[in-house]
Amino acid sequence: MMENTKIDVLGTEYAIKIVKVSECDDLKNNKFCALCNNLTHTILLGDASEEEFFGSMTEEEQEIQMKTTLRHEVIHAFLNESGLQDSAARIEAGWARNEEMVDWFAIQSPKIFKVFKELDIL
């Protein structure tokens, strides 16, 4: 099972907290399995062992679910700390043709992969 920890996201410390969805209004009320809060620099990750919210999964499926979800939230954290949380403007072409986004991934991916490796979520 994953544990609570802290990570460095472009110089900002983010706390990762594994929480029971049933005990976390932010997740439960929004029907989220996780969230990244750029104001508190916290990632809340729902404990996939709660059948009420995640269904019946094997331990392996729970681990895969949590690692996949945590990777998603870590990407949000990197986007937030890069100043892109408010840059959700409409783009004429698909986002994959957005050179700014492609550049961002090219520049930031080594740092993101370092955090993924530290968290053992690759």
Q: Where on the chain are the PLM-derived regions?
A:
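Hydrophobic (often cysteine-bearing) scaffold residues that line and stabilize catalytic clefts
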Residues: 63, 67, 71, 98
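Active-site recognition of the HExxH zinc-binding catalytic motif
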Residues: 68-80
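Metalloprotease/metallohydrolase-associated module, dominated by Zn2+-dependent proteases
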Residues: 1-61, 81-122
